[in-house]
Amino acid sequence: MVQLYDHRPSPVKWWTLSGDPPGPLYNHANIKLQQGMAELALAYRIIDDRRAMGKGELSLDWGMAENLAYASLLTEGYPVRLSGQDCGRGTFFHRHAKLHDQNRVVWHQGAYVPLQHLQEGQKDFVVIDSILSEEAVLAYEYGYATAEPDSLVLWEAQFGDFANGAQVVIDQFITSGEAKWGRLCGLVMLLPHGYEGQGAEHSSGRIERYLQLCADYNIQVCVPSTAAQMFHLLRRQMLRPLRKPLVVFTP
């Protein structure tokens, strides 16, 4: 049983020991596409930028920080499961955790997931572009996260506004399951938020609604302002001996 409200320091100390990135992080920064794979020009540009970030030539952006957090956890013994309607690419095309061969013959073939190829013996990274039902998918991921406390389980809304399609799951399970049934859950909800000009119901994750649901340390509501905060926020969700739902309003 995970101890409640235990905020002991993280047991992992490697990032304080050296300024050089560990091998798995460098491997992910130095992405190599499969031979003969044809990618979109935009994806190529993002990959080239990440290689430059790995060399210290560019500052880390949000997508790189998030992917590096996953890479570090995968090689430290924590499986990562990410699902959502557009999570392979990311709503604002920042993630690109799944790359597609533009010359593929069959639609479901020709995909390459760099986070599955970090090193021998790493844990599984699963990224699922899910069905268009927030309620069904979020409910499933909540159950998965409660049953697998040593896996980082994330659900991403296509836009933060759309999460209200699963409001019953949020109200009755995620924010109150521990108080009602003693069910600990480390589920992460990623809610893209704050982009104007995307049309009606495409710019606000409605932070105020989640703050109204906060009571007695039942959930964590975070609005990171730097890429570094995003990196450590995701790692902390697994490394500290505490399992609380995490709601992240992502840029």
What are these regions (language model features)?
Residues 1-251:
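Flexible, glycine-rich loop/tail regions that form catalytic "lids" or insertion modules at the edges
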